[in-house]
Amino acid sequence: MSSGKIAQVVGPVVDVMFASGDKLPEINNALIVYKDSDKKQKIVLEVALELGDGMVRTIAMESTDGLTRGLEVLDTGRAISVPVGKETLGRVFNVLGETIDLEEPFAEDVDRQPIHKKAPSFDELSTSSEILETGIKVIDLLAPYLKGGKVGLFGGAGVGKTVLIQELIHNIAQEHGGISVFTGVGERTREGNDLYWEMKESGVIEKTAMVFGQMNEPPGARMRVALTGLTIAEYFRDVEGQDVLLFIDNIFRFTQAGSEVSALLGRMPSAVGYQPTLATEMGQLQERITSTQKGSVTSIQAIYVPADDYTDPAPATAFAHLDSTTNLERKLTQMGIYPAVDPLASSSRALSPEIVGEEHYAVATEVQRVLQRYRELQDIIAILGMDELSDEEKTLVGRARRIQFFLSQNFNVAEQFTGLPGSYVPVAETVRGFKEILEGKYDHLPEDAFRSVGPIEDVIKKAEKMGF
């Protein structure tokens, strides 16, 4: 094990000098430095660049407070490796695989795997055309998710990405019954804590591994924690042949952490100040999140959109890798429609008659047509009023508004805030409900009866309570 000495510390970036005759550590190798003489407080560094003349530049996975020039640094000879397998289920740990749930740490002999790996080769890949039912009407109808597919939840600040991902965990992890891996990347610690206790209460935690590198962590940890979660998911897929659900909240923070580190590594910034290696880093992560002939990984990723600008390089780069996109729209939150999913901007390659069936496809496309026409008529209504519309257009507007409200739904995870019980709506019920609205069966019911309900029967009950 070769050793060197700290030459420079600049925030999370540490330069290490190795003696001229020593073998330099390889890129992505983990180095260890002890802050105290008792060797109790260690910091893990990851090699990012070789600068020449025996100097390497590293990124710290923990705070560099207390590091001084001249401290000894040891090369472990391998990449950061984390625990994998059944022992990780029901546990919470950090980027290095150290437990943070106040329970017993992992045994020394637990299986470990390096976080840096190659993506599966082309001939190992497998595709599926099976739909993953979420129980959320707007998603199941207009942008259905594929088993083994990649899903992106796009939205600006405060539009409901984390609540939606928590509802998906509640619905899918409980219905799916398989193994789930939740990776918190640079998000709020409070949300992670709430999620942990909710999962513990519901019993879902027994089949879930949770990995966190939250907002308060240094950028090195936030940059690598997604790979830690992915390594655990890959083990369940490849070694145990399982179908795995991988939740990542938030993939933008992965890019943001890379951007923070990039300038300190001496790279010239690219568009909007992002790192020049943005597309490569995103590709290396996303290409590993895939399904093989041994098992599948269905990934659901929350993606923050800075200033609601979808042309920003970070969300735009992520778009290219996804099968389904669920776009959250701020205007809908202002109208009190939750989940605030934009039915026209969201898309899925699964929405085709071959995959979802003729009836589902016909109802979904008609819903989109009606909503698109309503959007076009809104300018006329705003300027001239409803009276200028033809009878046919007035009927269409009425149905479009009912559809828009019926796309909203109460969530189980939001019950403590709204006081309203959450609902899980099977796909067949969703399709039937929208088909009947399009046929005009409920034109006589008030629009408010369609707001924040589950299946169409809830609308009828709500309307009866309102005196209709």
From Swiss-Prot:
Its main location: membrane. GO terms for cellular component: plasma membrane; proton-transporting ATP synthase complex. It catalyses: ATP + H2O + 4 H(+)(in) = ADP + phosphate + 5 H(+)(out). Produces ATP from ADP in the presence of a proton gradient across the membrane. The catalytic sites are hosted primarily by the beta subunits. This is ATP synthase subunit beta. ATP binds at G155, G156, A157, G158, V159, G160, K161, T162. It comes from Streptococcus pyogenes serotype M4 (strain MGAS10750). It is a peripheral membrane protein. It is found in: Cell membrane. Keywords: ATP synthesis, ATP-binding, Cell membrane, CF(1), Hydrogen ion transport, Ion transport, Membrane, Nucleotide-binding, Translocase, Transport. Its EC number is 7.1.2.2. F-type ATPases have 2 components, CF(1) - the catalytic core - and CF(0) - the membrane proton channel. CF(1) has five subunits: alpha(3), beta(3), gamma(1), delta(1), epsilon(1). CF(0) has three main subunits: a(1), b(2) and c(9-12). The alpha and beta chains form an alternating ring which encloses part of the gamma chain. CF(1) is attached to CF(0) by a central stalk formed by the gamma and epsilon chains, while a peripheral stalk is formed by the delta and b chains. Pfam families: ATP-synt_ab, ATP-synt_ab_N, ATP-synt_VA_C. Belongs to the ATPase alpha/beta chains family. It is an enzyme of class 7 (translocase). GO terms for molecular function: ATP binding; ATP hydrolysis activity; proton-transporting ATP synthase activity, rotational mechanism.
